[in-house]
């Protein structure tokens, strides 16, 4: 596989992936994928699908930290079939119980990628049978630990980020990377999956980090910044960067798994997607940002200060931010250059 397509190992001829998928252009000049659109109860590729997948390597670690790899044997492949059979028999009831997502993927800039490139139409399609089985068992146990459900939800999110069909293999360090190593849904020609032991270790670390992470007297409030009424000497903000990252789409990946647990832990919360409330487009972005920063300015003293974390590669967006600050009654007194963590 190259950036140009699939290369034949015999003749070295390259065939674009779009040709293999059977993509076509409709009457409105939109590219339409030729892939089969998965049904709600699907969790695996069908035999006659253009794409399919198979287990082809297993990584082992010895007690002294040594690593080795081998191809799956008959027992491994039989286990895979057994897992698929279990999921096939339970997927509908799991969805009804909220143990596995039943939420459809809504069309959007980022979410269209998995629909177009794989035919996946529901969020659970981004997880294979073994991953669905493991995560459904975790949620089952979480529902019995109501006292710690809040911790469990955060740890679940960490787990689904590290246990999906979008987790790539880092050949340099010989380990798998999480789903969101950048802010996108990148479908892969080969991906990795964790074992129960590896997932438990990650889960345990998440619980420990979360329980130790917040100490002292803190208050966390989920509120529209335009409605904030507290006064403060300093406001520190990390605003969205125009349309650079579609958080309203990406967050639905987690919401699909969290829905039942959120309803049990916080019954007063609204648990559907709030995509419709996302600030999109230059006009709405500027208007909303001015309202937010004007409100913050009105709730700090004359000698107060605001620190704004803002990274963007488009100079026009920086000019837009400067106008927003000025129209909000602020003036820039200092600026620091930083290196961002991703190039997305």
State each model region's role.
Residues 238:
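Substrate-binding/specificity loop regions of serine endopeptidase catalytic domains
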């Amino acid at each position: 596989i190259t950036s140009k397509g699939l290369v034949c190992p015999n003749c070295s001829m390259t065939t674009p992936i779009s040709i293999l998928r059977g993509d076509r252009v409709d009457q409105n000049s939109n590219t339409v994928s030729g892939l089969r659109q998965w049904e709600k109860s699907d969790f695996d590729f069908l035999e006659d699908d253009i794409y399919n997948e198979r287990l082809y390597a297993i990584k082992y670690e010895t007690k002294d930290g040594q690593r080795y790899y081998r191809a799956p044997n008959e027992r491994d492949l039989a286990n895979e079939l057994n897992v698929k059979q279990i999921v096939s028999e339970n997927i509908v009831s799991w969805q009804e119980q909220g143990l596995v997502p039943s939420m459809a993927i809504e069309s959007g800039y980022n979410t269209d990628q998995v629909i177009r490139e794989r035919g996946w139409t529901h969020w659970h399609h981004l997880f294979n049978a073994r991953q669905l089985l493991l995560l459904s068992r975790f949620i089952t146990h979480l529902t019995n630990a109501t006292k710690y459900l809040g911790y469990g939800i955060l740890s679940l999110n960490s787990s689904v980020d590290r246990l999906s069909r979008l987790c790539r293999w880092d050949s340099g360090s010989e380990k798998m990377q999480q789903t969101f190593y950048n802010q996108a849904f990148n479908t892969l020609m080969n991906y990795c999956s964790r074992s129960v032991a590896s997932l438990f270790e990650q889960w345990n670390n998440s619980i420990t980090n979360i329980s130790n992470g917040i100490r002292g007297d803190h208050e966390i409030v989920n509120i529209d910044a335009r409605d904030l009424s507290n006064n403060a000497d300093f406001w520190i903000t990390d605003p969205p960067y125009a349309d650079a990252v579609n958080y309203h789409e990406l967050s639905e990946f987690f919401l699909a798994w969290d829905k039942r647990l959120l309803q049990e832990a916080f019954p007063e919360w609204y648990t559907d997607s709030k995509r419709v409330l996302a600030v999109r487009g230059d006009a709405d972005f500027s208007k909303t940002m001015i309202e937010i920063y004007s409100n913050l300015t009105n709730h700090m003293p004359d000698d107060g200060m605001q620190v704004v974390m803002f990274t963007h590669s488009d100079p026009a967006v920086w000019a837009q931010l400067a106008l927003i600050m000025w129209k909000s009654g602020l003036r820039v007194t200092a600026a620091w250059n930083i290196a961002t963590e991703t190039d997305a």
